[in-house]
Amino acid sequence: ATSIALKIHFPLAWAVKPTLYKQFVGGETLQDCSAAINHLMKYNVKSTLDYSAESEQTPEGIQATFEETLRSIDFAKGNTNLAYAVFKPSTITTDELLAKASEKREELTIDDVRHFREFRERFMALCQRAYDNDVRILVDAEDYCFQDAIDALTDEAMRKFNKKRAIVFATLQMYRHDRMPYLRRIYDDAVAKGYIAGVKFVRGAYMEAERARAAALDYPDPICKDKQATDENY
């Protein structure tokens, strides 16, 4: 029913806001979130600021998301009720570029290289702002086809900003069977280069889509063979 209503542009806010909205959304602005943040802290539960609005992957949409994420990092400065800020790399570039940079780097055009450089600058600017404000920041995990490029930038950011304490955190989806070897590489690199690895563990969020894509494009399934294997990784 909800999907039909959205297709025909039927107004749902009157029903969603008092029900589902209250369960899943802290607020529409940073200031709106303050009440929920303060309420949770009464139970010794810290919050994480996550700008989850879906914007178009246009230059204007990407810039708007980037600027709002910067504001969320500034908002978290000195706020002991907040545990982390977070950003989703695919919201500050395009899916097409992330997939190409991860899987077909040899096919990157001059324009692709320029756009990736701009993406890297935005990525590092968010981490720099987190470092300057002493705010820990989570780099959200994404689809398998995007992750190699994200991992490379996250590794670079950890080497730069995690010298004294963990500021930048990678997110590892442990239903992927390649995440344990990657975790070992992070650890070895941190020891060798003298920084503190920041790692957040999650089980994973895209299993059906990942398996369907692997089958469609005929590459090995990146997901663990069963729940037990995921549990052991996690």
Spans of features found by a protein language model:
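Positively charged, amphipathic and often flexible ligand-engagement surfaces
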Residues: A1-Y234
